[in-house]
Amino acid sequence: MRKILFFGLLSICFLFVFFFYKQKENKIIYNKIVEKFEDNVVIDETYTHLFKDSNLKELVFIKSRLIIPELEHKKMMKATGYRADAYRALSTVYKFDFKVHDNKILGFKSVIFEGFEDAKVSKHENNLPSEKWQQLKDFNIGDPNINEKFFHLEFPFVVKNTLCVTISKGFFKKIKKLKRLKIMLISNEDREYKIDIENFLPKYNL
């Protein structure tokens, strides 16, 4: 009788731990912002995954869509020229924001998505508009040395660093097929920040 009771309680504990782990892993904070200016609309959808056990505090996936009615017309979508090309490239933007807390200002020289180690990475500044955005292959991590003159400083407070990684629509479709998101960030100090979470991207209409 005692053995049955013991194994029964043990099973309940395992189920509770598993349920708690799944709840923790699947905790995604969703937010949607719609802004209008004149006849144009900007829609930002964010999906935030929180971490508790490391300096890497948040992974935020952002889908931004710009809707300009006059350029949504079929004829305009087939048009050529800088304005039409830029709109096609930028009408929908996908990006990850990685938020890392430290007592220093950090730069990130490399981002690796497991399974796509040979991805084509660009490192230009996140300035818009730019012809470089139209040439985005897989993803862009920005200039890792843009704050290089501050790297040696240490502060008596928490510095909230944000690495913005913009990904192409084609690369987004590839990582959306993964079962898990396994991503490694490498800082200017060669410190590694690893992510291994359930891939939440297929669950949403993105």
Swiss-Prot record:
Keywords: Cell outer membrane, Membrane, Plasmid, Signal, Virulence. One of its GO terms (cellular component) is cell outer membrane. The keyword Transferase does not apply. It is found in: Cell outer membrane. Pfam families: BPTA. Its main location: membrane. InterPro entries: BptA. Residues 1-19 form the signal peptide. Virulence-associated protein essential for survival of the bacterium within the tick host and therefore within the natural life cycle of the spirochete. Belongs to the BptA family. This is Protein BptA. It comes from Borrelia bissettiae (strain DSM 17990 / CIP 109136 / DN127). The gene is bptA.
